[in-house]
A protein has these predicted regions:
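Long, non-catalytic terminal segments
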Residues: 1-26, 30-37
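N-terminal low-complexity or amphipathic/hydrophobic leaders
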Residues: 22-53, 61-62
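Glycine-rich phosphate- or other oxyanion-binding loops that anchor nucleotides, phosphorylated ligands
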Residues: 2-13, 50-166
């Protein structure tokens, strides 16, 4: 196991020891504008990422850096209150950390949020926009750094969006 995989395992073990048998079904990664959504979660466990050795810290204003285990409408949730960005200087191994933790908790449904209002001037703050594709201007594939044992097997490799959720 290399150092990156060791960091994933250390953080997972620390969290798992605290949450025990709590088994989230859905992972939410809350970006700018929806961090406040965390107030809607009936929280069972909250982890400050500043206290998790090996976990990258978000530097974006408004990203609290909490990992929350809780419930919304009787659905068990793992929520990341703040995202980690490649443009912050983090490696792809660090950017995918929340995805890897979600997979380690056997979560198969992932919902990420972001600010995308700039793509259409008719969008207003708070509008919900479902994306079914994206343009990767970094020319880096974050999936390539996820250990093969933790990758979700997909029928279609080019697009990781799930039509039934959209």
């Amino acid at each position: 196991m290399n150092q990156k995989e060791n960091n994933y395992q250390l953080v997972y073990n620390h969290i798992k020891q605290k949450v025990g048998n709590f088994s989230p079904q859905i992972c939410l990664i809350l970006g700018s504008g929806l961090g406040v959504f965390a107030s809607e979660i009936n929280k069972h466990f909250i982890f400050d990422t500043n206290d998790l050795k090996g976990y990258p810290k978000s530097t974006v204003s408004g990203h609290k850096g909490n990992i929350i285990f809780g419930e919304i409408n009787e659905k068990k949730i793992l929520a990341f209150q703040g995202r980690i960005h490649y443009y912050e200087g983090y490696s792809l191994n660090e950017v995918v950390f929340p995805i890897i933790l979600a997979k380690m908790f056997n979560i198969s449904t992932l919902i990420t949020t972001n600010v995308s209002g700039g793509i259409n001037p008719s969008y207003k703050p708070g509008d919900i926009v479902f994306l079914d594709n994206h343009i990767n201007l970094t020319f880096k594939n974050p999936i390539s750094v996820i250990p093969k044992s933790l990758r979700i097997k997909r029928k279609y490799k080019l697009c990781e969006y799930e039509p039934k959720i959209l």
